[in-house]
Amino acid sequence: MIEQFYDLKPEVLALDRQALALCREQFAHVEGIRDYNQLKMLRAFTDSGVAAQHFFGSTGYGVWDDSRNKLEEVFCRCVGAEAALVRPQFMSGTHTLTVALFGLLRTGDTLLAATGRPYDTLEGVIGIGEAGKGCGTLREYGIRYDEVPLKEDFTPDYAGIAAKAKTATVVHIQRSRGYTQRNAFDLDTIRKVAQTVREVNPNAVIFVDNCYGEFTQTKEPLSAGADIIAGSFIKNPGGGITPTGGYIAGRKDLVEKISHRFTAPGIGADLGCTQDSLRDTFLGLYYAPGVVCEAVKTAIYAQCLLELCGVHPVPRYTEDHNDIVTCFDSGSVAALQGFCAGIQKNSPVDSFVSPEPADEPGYTDKVIMASGSFTEGSTIEISCDGPLRPPYTCYLQGGVNFTAGRAAVINAVQNAFFA
């Protein structure tokens, strides 16, 4: 059917048919995860007693916003948290993580990155090198930073973690890959890092950046030893519907502590109006398990198709998936730009736009991005990006439905490797 809508070369169509056949077993596996998570989501809604009245938000201060409180109750049930902040005021994943870090850390405390250097945009938050200099970084507030690089095989250095965690206040784990070519960490790895830390420092706070990982498995990192998780609602948990916002969830005492940085000291979680955002946030969250499944299926298909083209993606399509991201070395500026152009041209919004490399806040290299999304910056909708530095690695994520995701991917592959 796809050839009725797109001018695809015979050799590309043959690879498409082969990829679909090879992916059947993996598709069935992630559909099983979807079904479990959707039933868990349904029970979260029914057990919390969500009513139509909860779709109406508040204005002004947002004091006594029962609808906001109900949303946070539902989210807690979904991720196994004691408490949560689910708020439209969080502008991005980086902003959400920043609020959490500044809420947890005080002058003289130490932040330890246990899984290597964090994502590029967090370098400015922490104050690594010249990033964020003069902007009020953690380091400028007297908070120490240390990190444990990953081993050569991209696995955690548990001995290094044990040595450095003894004096750490907060231990940061980044579940997804950032701009590195490693697999997302599974829950067993997160659990082992947490156990390693607690053996030498029981009081350390285990903080997991959960961006891109929500609902890819049947459990979340709070069940694997994390104390706090954080992420963005324009990624997985928003289901491609929620237009903005983020979440911080976990231990009640820690969420309370963070809430005073989210608003102001002495005010905490009681303030924060929701205006007209609640219906879309409830709806996006409800649909998230199914949408995440479609994104993972798009990733599996892309990985298989790329392998058939002689490209080596991470992860492989046969591996377990713990985020929605696929990365691969395109090998050249032309291939990277060609793949991004193919994704952009076959996206529902701004399909006529040609992606061009540009400077982006928080990044040291020019970055090329393709995103024809309904929500600006959404990465649960299909998008791809990559820094313009050798080996010109491309990062593909999202796809709110597999049919459209497949169309974008196959056209991008043809554009990059069969031009």
What are the residue ranges of the model-derived segments?
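Conserved residues at beta->alpha junctions
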Residues: P88, A249, S330
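Conserved PLP-enzyme active-site core in the AAT-like
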Residues: I2-R24, E31, M41-D47, A51-H54, ...
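Active-site-flanking structural segment that lines cofactor/substrate pockets
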Residues: F55-L85
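Conserved C-terminal alpha-helix-loop-beta "cap" of PLP-dependent enzymes
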Residues: E307-A419
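Structural motif
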Residues: E82-V86, D109-L112, T169-V170, A204-I206, ...
